[in-house]
Amino acid sequence: MNSLLMITACLALVGTVWAKEGYLVNSYTGCKYECFKLGDNDYCLRECKQQYGKGAGGYCYAFGCWCTHLYEQAVVWPLKNKTCNGK
């Protein structure tokens, strides 16, 4: 019983440590969501949570919204076959 509990705890920890991160992307244009206030940013946090769920976090990194704590299948920038108007 203790072994099963330890295995379950380890699997939960691995899922937390290896959570996906990436730039928030507009699926129609392929462009990143831009931001100008670097670091903690209410806009990025709100947009990341809206697109990826309440567990997601977000902040402004290199003038783009960077989302954290995403599920593994989350779609992030860059998108295949989407060039963001050549940018």
UniProtKB/Swiss-Prot annotation:
Transmembrane helix in keyword set: no
**Which UniProt keywords are listed?**
Amidation, Disulfide bond, Ion channel impairing toxin, Neurotoxin, Secreted, Signal, Toxin, Voltage-gated sodium channel impairing toxin
Q: Where in the cell is it found?
A: Secreted
What does the tissue specificity note say?
A: Expressed by the venom gland.
Paired cysteines (S-S): C31-C84, C35-C60, C44-C65, C48-C67
Q: Which InterPro entries match?
A: LCN-type_CS_alpha_beta_dom, Scorpion_toxin-like, Scorpion_toxin-like_sf, Scorpion_toxinL
Entry comment, domain topic: Has the structural arrangement of an alpha-helix connected to antiparallel beta-sheets by disulfide bonds (CS-alpha/beta).
Post-translational modification Asparagine amide, affected residues = N85
Tell me its family: Belongs to the long (4 C-C) scorpion toxin superfamily. Sodium channel inhibitor family. Beta subfamily.
Q: Which organism is it from?
A: Centruroides noxius (Mexican scorpion)
Query: Which Gene Ontology terms cover its molecular function?
Result: sodium channel inhibitor activity; toxin activity
Could you tell me what this protein is called?
Beta-toxin Cn4
**Gene Ontology annotations of biological process type:** defense response
Q: Fetch the SUPFAM superfamilies from UniProt.
A: Scorpion toxin-like
| Function of the protein | Beta toxins bind voltage-independently at site-4 of sodium channels (Nav) and shift the voltage of activation toward more negative potentials thereby affecting sodium channel activation and promoting spontaneous and repetitive firing. This toxin affects the activation mechanism of sodium channels of squid axon. It also competes with Cn2 in rat brain synaptosomes. Is lethal to mice.
Give the range the annotation lists for the signal sequence: 1-19
Major localization listed first in the record, in broad terms = secreted
All copies of the LCN-type CS-alpha/beta domain together span 20-85
A GO cellular component annotation here is: extracellular region
